[in-house]
Amino acid sequence: MPTHHCTTLLLLFLLQPPIVAHAADRTEVINDLLSWAKDEGGIVDNIKVGNSSINGAGRALNLVAPRSEGSVLVSVPLNMLVTDNVARADPTMIKHVLSFPPEVLAIDSCMAVTLFLMLEQLNITGLSSHSKWLRYWNSLPPLDHRFNLPQLEWNSTEQGRAALDVLLSSPSMAQRLHKERSLHDKSMEKLQDTVFFSLNKAYSSTVPNLMKKLKQAFVWSKSVILTRSWTKPHSSIAGECTMVPILDLLNHDDQGGGLIAVAFDDQPGRIHSFGVLATKDVGTDEEVFDSYDPPTSPNQIKCVQDMFVGFGFLPLRGSSNRPWCFNLMFPIKTMTFATPAANMAQLLQLKQWNAKRGDLFTIQLKEGDKTLPNSLLVVLRLCVSDEKDIALAQRRGNALAPLSLRNERKVLATIWTVMSKNLAHIPSSGGQDQRQLDEGVNDQMAIALRIRIHERNICVQTLDQIKELWLHAMLLKELV
């Protein structure tokens, strides 16, 4: 399917895009991959293997000639993608993974692609030596590569463990990492009793230490998928995790071009390739960057910490406008009223904010915000309401404004208590952390200290906002 006949470009919702700061740097391997893409109809003549302008990023893809804004700099045909459907069609996957009933082993799309990559990497059956994607697999990091993912990798070195201790003293980050690690450990335990057991039974006689190799390859594969895959690159592609060869070699820049889908002129809904557009005029030898967020959806820009947990780095380069965030979570608990109508009114009001009894409500507090998020205040007002408060919210149609002085006092006191505890959890002052940064520390410790500084700032900011909101409520004459 030749791509040069296509002019329709569809900008895509990009949620979970890739990064390769330390990928395989052998030029011939990348050139072989580019040659494959060209043979399949991809646009790769604009790029060559070069060196990144990002400190420590190593290899990059650079332009061989100037290109104007809006040009497709590089594209990859659809049949080169590694998708959920590809993984589930693999014979080894069918026999040793998908043969387990869902109640024993539920395999979502990301796990399917992860296990497929693991099997291809280990080449247990010998079939991977002739894999269609062999040139792509060769471009991936080696099995012993250390990804900068704290939930999986930082415990492996003394330097990493010291940085992890600092990172875990940041309350929001600690909560997130503990959850990620717990989910990983549960997955590993379930896989050992099912997939790994099945593979070990079938191939241990020909592959020494297979169980150990499976565990190592799974962590490697999970790290690759986490840092390189796209979520929902297009509605026509099933699954939440898709690997796009070549495009996952691009380094990240917030000013870079987001992933685009190229469709046939006469069939706009039929996609045949994916690529990256030039967001400005670019010159010879300039690096091709990818942006990790929907370029037309500023409200869906990931927070700095989201980038770190997902891709292993802090996006601090250039004029990034990414916010630092603090994930605040609390269970939704409400009293049961004597009047059924009041109970229904409360449930309907909560539903407007995608909340319901028994849920764990999560909200991101962002550094620099002028006040607390409406969703946080509204949900808490509804949670601590009595029947009189609910009746008032029902008459208004919402709980965007304080309902009563008693109600608002409970709301603000709840947030104050939580954020005071979070601030007390942080052992040092911001000044101490900044001085340590200024004196010079390793990269992992620098990341941990920066995150702790900003989480502390958000705790202090939130407590100040609560004071202002309380003073405002006290001055409202209609509140009793």
Regions found by a protein language model. Give the residues of each.
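Long, positively charged leader/targeting segments at protein N-termini
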Residues: 22-80, 84-89, 104, 120-480
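Intrinsically disordered, low-complexity polar regions and short flexible loop motifs
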Residues: 92-102
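Secreted/periplasmic proteins
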Residues: 108-111, 298
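Short amphipathic beta-strand segments in non-cytosolic proteins
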Residues: 113-116
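Cleavable N-terminal signal peptides of Sec/SRP-targeted secreted and luminal proteins
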Residues: 4-21
